[in-house]
Structure formats: C-alpha cells, structure tokens
Amino acid sequence: FLQYAVAMSQFTRTPAFTGYVAEAQRNAIEKMLEPRVWKYWRWENLWGNLRWEPDPLRRDNVMLSGYWGVMIGVYESLNGDRRYNEPGSLTFRNGSRETYPYDFGRVAQLMRGNLLGSPFCMFPCEPSWIYPFCSSYALNTVILHDRLNGGDPGDVISGYRDSFDRDFMRPDGRLVAIRNGRLGFAVAAAPTINEAVLVPWLNPGVPELARRLWWLMREQVIDLEGDEVLPTIRNLDRVDVGNYRYGKDTFA
C-alpha cells in the first residue's frame, strides 16, 4: 500500500515528474523480492495444501502475487518504464541455488491462469480461503498488463463478474467476504470494511458491481445526518482485519 500511496501522489500532484518518486516505487516493488518477504509461503503451502512448492507465485498466494502485480502495473502506467517487462527482471532469489525468474508478463499470465483455473474465477490468499477483495488485485493485474501491452482481459472480467454474482453475493446484495475454495462453504459474517475497500478495486473491471455495492453500503451502512457521516458499527467491525483481533485503537 505504500507504493500505491506514492503512485497516487505522483498521479495527482506531480504527473510529469519521475525522479525520486519513481525510484521510491521501484524500491517498494523490488523489496518484495527479499527472501524475508516471501519465504513464508513454502511453509503455509506445506501445512495448508500438503504440497512442497517454495515458488511464491506459481499457485495461490494472491496476497503476494496480486498486490505485487498491481504495483508493477501502476508503476509502468505512470512512468512509461518497461524495465520489468524484460525476462528475469523480477527474480526471487534465496541463496545461489534457489531462483524463480519472473517479469511483469509472467506475473500477469499466472494471475490469468490462476483465476480462470478456479471454479470461482478467484483464488486463495491463505491456503483454501478465497477473498473477493484479494482476487480483485489479480484481476487488476491482468487489466493493467493487457492495457499496456495490447491484450484482452475480457475472459477474466466476465468470469470474475459471474462468480461474484453467483458465489460471493448474499440475497440482500451484500458481500460474501470469505469462501473456502476447497469445501465451498462461506463465512457468513464479515466486517463492513471488506466491502468498503473492495469498491474502488472493482471499478476498473466491473464498475457496475462497484456502483451497486457502494449504493447498498450508503443505504444500509452509512447514516447521513446533516453534515455528519455516521457509519453503523457492529462489534464485528471492531476487528482489525490485519491480525483478526479486537482492539480499542482499531478505529481510532
């Protein structure tokens, strides 16, 4: 999210300037290649999927791959810099014997394959657990890459849209925020923030879903009284979605 913030600052304040603003974004992108950032996946994959696969991008793990893909796509969109399109320009290294070479094209190809290879057209963060919010980053990675390189993301967009309506929308129009991709069951309740943060990430590919979800939130969650905006806060909304704990400073 740090890279997104710097990119938004560049886009809204200094669109003609690259310099250290672009350098800061590159640093954030390349920091993701540090083993301390990505080595967790080999162990999560082992206990969660009973599979030894140290490569952090090949399957699942959209909490790394999707977010990272958007970082690269946003950087290229703003700066016209195609360095990350070169083969091997984004290589994960753990010592001299363990390497996983990638580039923006390969990352986007993996996002497309993981999305279309899932019956939900979404794929897990943690093993088995699918979040529409996280998979929206994979969707946007494909959209960004194809816009910059002349591809067509239509199959991914339509698959995501259909699955969102079919598998991740409650009868009242609110979001099913978490579903188990292996067993199919959903976690019935979820914090409102899951819907709020999803809206802007739906907008590039499926704007009709973004508008519908935002309208429902305004009608059902937000109480507009005069000049005040008062969200309806439930106990569940006090959970910090980063560590799944209650905390008095969660909404400070």
Describe each PLM feature range.
Residues 5-130, 135-136, 174-176:
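Extended ligand-binding groove/face enriched in aromatic
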